[in-house]
Amino acid sequence: MKTKTDFLKMKEQGEPITMLTAYDYPSAKLAEEAEVDMILVGDSLGMVVLGYDSTVPVTVEDMIHHTKAVRRGAKETFIVTDMPFMSYHVSPQDTMVNARRIVQESGAHALKVEGAGEVISTIHYLTSAGIPVVAHLGLTPQSVGVLGGYKVQGKDAESAKKLIEDAKRCEEAGAIALVLECVPMQLAKFISKQLTIPTIGIGAGQKVDGQVLVYHDLISYGVNRVPKFVKQYTSVQEEIVRGISQYVTEVKTGQFPEEKHSFTMKEEECLALYGGKQ
């Protein structure tokens, strides 16, 4: 299993880091078989798995439950778990309780937190206690209400400068990596060169140290639309609907199940049961 030391070496050597979300045993198992470097159990599970309109309703219990399943499916892959909405915007003591629960009960190797500001002290607090933390800047889904929706961040010089400073502060606070979401590629490139820790982009262009996508977006599974920055590599949704539709048709028309899908009794047992008559 790769560790944070390996990820630092990958950045130094210019080897791109691959990260993918996973929310359950089968998706994690497939991600590991495909040799993904790092798995993110994102609070995006609220939308793509639980059917919420945003990540806000996701709880600590949700994150623990799903991360445990992911760990069972990907025992040899570094796993990062999101701290959900408001689980780290509380007192330092309560933040530590939530963080400890996620790590101890789920088996996550690192936690991810969004934003800067007061979150910088949280990063320092958690890393000082021995909990690896991945920072997340740019578009931070837990704060879309404050940001005015799902919009690209850092498009003007002033906001870009703030993101640069925030990125440096995240590294200084002890973050082991930084996710940059929906920021101009020029800005992402500049930030990546300023930091010694890896940057993982999602909608941040090519010149970052790695990429992350949502599992369901990548394979077109249960999603009606995807953001501009997503490339869909296959469409399992079409195959799934086709298969289920065929099943429904065959049950309705009596084509399924066939005899080969059924179990039988020996003739003498049938005679003993009902005299051979049906």
From Swiss-Prot:
One of the protein's GO biological processes: pantothenate biosynthetic process
Cofactor(s) the protein needs: Mg(2+)
Chief localization: cytoplasm
Pfam families named among the record's database cross-references: Pantoate_transf (PF02548)
Record's catalysed reaction(s): 3-methyl-2-oxobutanoate + (6R)-5,10-methylene-5,6,7,8-tetrahydrofolate + H2O = 2-dehydropantoate + (6S)-5,6,7,8-tetrahydrofolate
Entry note: cofactor: Binds 1 Mg(2+) ion per subunit.
Annotated localization: Cytoplasm
UniProt keyword annotation of Glycoprotein present: no
Pathway where it operates: Cofactor biosynthesis; (R)-pantothenate biosynthesis; (R)-pantoate from 3-methyl-2-oxobutanoate: step 1/2
Domain of life: Bacteria
UniProt keyword Protease present: no
Record-annotated active site: 181 (proton acceptor)
Record-listed Mg(2+) binding positions: 43, 82, 114
Key words of the record: Cytoplasm, Magnesium, Metal-binding, Pantothenate biosynthesis, Transferase
A molecular function GO annotation: 3-methyl-2-oxobutanoate hydroxymethyltransferase activity
Principal EC category: transferase
E.C. number(s) listed in UniProt: 2.1.2.11
Any one cellular-component term (Gene Ontology): cytoplasm
InterPro entries named among the record's database cross-references: Pantoate_hydroxy_MeTrfase, Pyrv/PenolPyrv_kinase-like_dom, Pyrv_kinase-like_dom_sf
Residues involved in 3-methyl-2-oxobutanoate binding: 43-44, 82, 112
Subunit structure: Homodecamer; pentamer of dimers.
Family: Belongs to the PanB family.
Function noted in UniProt: Catalyzes the reversible reaction in which hydroxymethyl group from 5,10-methylenetetrahydrofolate is transferred onto alpha-ketoisovalerate to form ketopantoate.
Name under which the protein is recorded: 3-methyl-2-oxobutanoate hydroxymethyltransferase
Annotated source species: Bacillus cereus (strain AH187)
Gene: panB
